[in-house]
């Protein structure tokens, strides 16, 4: 019985040191702000656009390590002449030392009137959805 206790103690000690040796990677990265604008410089916060504008999505992050991924998924939710919830495009980037990132979506033709959205993912998790209109 005493031999079993010693073996269990040795196994627990080995497990404890193994767990301590493993590096825990917990990110505190978060999106502090996200908004849409037709302005390339990122100024303004818009929810209504005209059909000839480029959509800029500005995303501000905090505590993001250099390997954090951000993804913007653009969708036509309820738009004239297209199926509901039509996927338009997506863009993904990996953060470096910056804390502000801009995604954009443009069209060679006029954007059809209707409801759109852009979903912002951080490290594969949906963090924010911005809805907007084209009139």
What is the predicted function of each stretch?
Residues 2-9:
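Bacterial N-terminal signal peptides that target proteins for export
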Residues 23-115, 119-131:
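Contiguous segments within soluble domain cores/interaction surfaces
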């Amino acid at each position: 019985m005493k031999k079993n206790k010693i073996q269990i103690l040795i196994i627990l000690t080995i497990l404890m040191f193994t767990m301590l040796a493993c590096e825990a990677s917990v990110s505190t990265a978060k999106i502090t702000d996200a908004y849409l604008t037709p302005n390339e410089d990122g100024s303004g916060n818009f929810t209504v656009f005209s059909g000839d504008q480029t959509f800029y999505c500005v995303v501000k992050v905090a505590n993001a390590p250099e390997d954090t991924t951000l993804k913007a998924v653009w969708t036509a939710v309820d738009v004239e002449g297209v199926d509901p919830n039509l996927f338009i495009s997506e863009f993904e980037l990996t953060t470096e030392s910056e804390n502000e990132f801009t995604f954009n979506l443009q069209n060679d033709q006029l954007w059809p009137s209707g409801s759109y959205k852009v979903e912002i993912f951080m490290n594969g998790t949906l963090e924010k959805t911005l809805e907007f209109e084209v009139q």
